[in-house]
From Swiss-Prot:
Protein name: Small ribosomal subunit protein uS11
Provenance organism: Parabacteroides distasonis (strain ATCC 8503 / DSM 20701 / CIP 104284 / JCM 5825 / NCTC 11152)
Cellular component per GO, a single term: ribonucleoprotein complex
NCBIfam families xref list: PRK05309.1 (NF003698), uS11_bact (TIGR03632)
Name of the encoding gene: rpsK
Coiled coil: none
GO molecular function, one term: rRNA binding
Record-linked Pfam families: Ribosomal_S11
UniProt superkingdom: Bacteria
Subunit composition and interactions: Part of the 30S ribosomal subunit. Interacts with proteins S7 and S18. Binds to IF-3.
Amino acid sequence: MAKKTVAAKKRNVKVDAYGQAHIHSSFNNIIVSLANSEGQVISWSSAGKMGFRSSKKNTPYAAQMAAQDCAKVAYDLGLRKVKVFVKGPGNGRESAIRTIHGAGIEVTEIVDVTPLPHNGCRPPKKRRV
């Protein structure tokens, strides 16, 4: 006898006019998530979700497409102003912020929260091309 599958119940998130935008930009991908003022995620997108593969995921254009997809959903739900938190050393940080602003969501503040080691792990060796 087959087990019955139960669909996961969708969480109701209260959307305010003011929220947060988190942009995580690594060397391989970029992830954009828009949240309300409590930090509950309203919408998210990434370059991989938008159909970019391999090295094309870490381009400013891929970041622009991911931010546009994410911002459109959040704007339709009622998000109007965001405080942007940027993390990571990747390429598409500025283009993602510009795209969020261009989608009609006002950017009030930009904070860089990139983690910096106090001489922690050994970094990867330099590439020889």
